[in-house]
């Protein structure tokens, strides 16, 4: 089986690959995450995932390199990782009682092939009180997460409904990824 590199330092992506039985190494991509002029959220996440994977693939051409990126959108506004606690509170207030979209893009690069794809998931929050938001932000959990919440952590109590791939919201649509890896002759279902 060809070696896989995850071009991400995300503990959540690492956990999901381990859960699925995908053998991999980690080399964190040093790409600056800047969002340029793109036509859609799906273009943004696939482009950023490709940039991350490409940066690592340059020096690791014998490997299959995975890059991923996740953003949250609400009414065409992109909610990335908050820069501080005040911004985290603002994002959570914005999402309170509403449905938003989570996009995760994935890029898989090998010497002979590149595949990109994305998953879109709708997440609906309960109405959140100021106290709930303050306590959650004080926990520091939302500070390194797109949209200022972690669906797999304490942020799960805010979620009323989800339509789509839960794992995509966590940071990696693992079921789709395993299927896409078959194009690279990697089949973890028989490992």
Curated annotation (Swiss-Prot):
Q: What is its EC number?
A: 3.6.1.9
Q: Where in the cell?
A: Cytoplasm
Give the superkingdom in one word: Bacteria
Co-factor(s): a divalent metal cation
Residues forming the catalytic site: 69
- The site annotation (Important for substrate specificity) covers 12, 70, 152
The answer, when asked if Protease is one of the entry's keywords, is: no
User: What's its catalytic activity?
Assistant: dTTP + H2O = dTMP + diphosphate + H(+); UTP + H2O = UMP + diphosphate + H(+)
Top-level EC class: hydrolase
- What residues form the membrane-spanning segments? none
Q: Which GO terms describe its molecular function?
A: dTTP diphosphatase activity; UTP diphosphatase activity
Gene Ontology annotations for the cellular component aspect, listed alphabetically:
cytoplasm
User: Record's SUPFAM superfamilies?
Assistant: ITPase-like (SSF52972)
Per its database record, what is this protein's job? Answer: Nucleoside triphosphate pyrophosphatase that hydrolyzes dTTP and UTP. May have a dual role in cell division arrest and in preventing the incorporation of modified nucleotides into cellular nucleic acids.
- Sequence similarity: Belongs to the Maf family. YhdE subfamily.
Quote the protein name from its UniProt record: dTTP/UTP pyrophosphatase
Q: Origin organism of this chain?
A: Bacillus thuringiensis subsp. konkukian (strain 97-27)
């Amino acid at each position: 089986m060809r070696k896989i590199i995850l071009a991400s330092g995300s503990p959540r992506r690492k956990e999901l690959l381990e859960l699925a039985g995908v053998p991999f190494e980690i080399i964190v991509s040093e790409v600056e995450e800047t969002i340029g002029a793109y036509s859609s959220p799906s273009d943004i996440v696939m482009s950023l995932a490709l940039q991350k994977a490409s940066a690592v693939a340059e020096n690791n051409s014998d490997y299959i390199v995975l890059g991923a990126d996740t953003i949250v959108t609400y009414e065409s506004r992109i909610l990335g990782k908050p820069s501080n606690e005040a911004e985290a509170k603002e994002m959570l207030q914005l999402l309170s009682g509403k449905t938003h979209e989570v996009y995760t893009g994935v890029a898989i690069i090998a010497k002979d092939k590149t595949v990109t794809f994305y998953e879109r998931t709708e997440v609906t929050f309960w109405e959140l009180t100021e106290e709930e938001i303050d306590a959650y932000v004080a926990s520091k959990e939302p500070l390194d997460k797109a949209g200022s919440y972690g669906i797999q952590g304490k942020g799960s109590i805010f979620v009323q409904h989800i339509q789509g791939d839960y794992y995509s919201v966590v940071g990696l649509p693992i079921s789709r990824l395993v299927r896409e890896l078959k194009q690279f002759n990697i089949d973890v279902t028989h490992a």
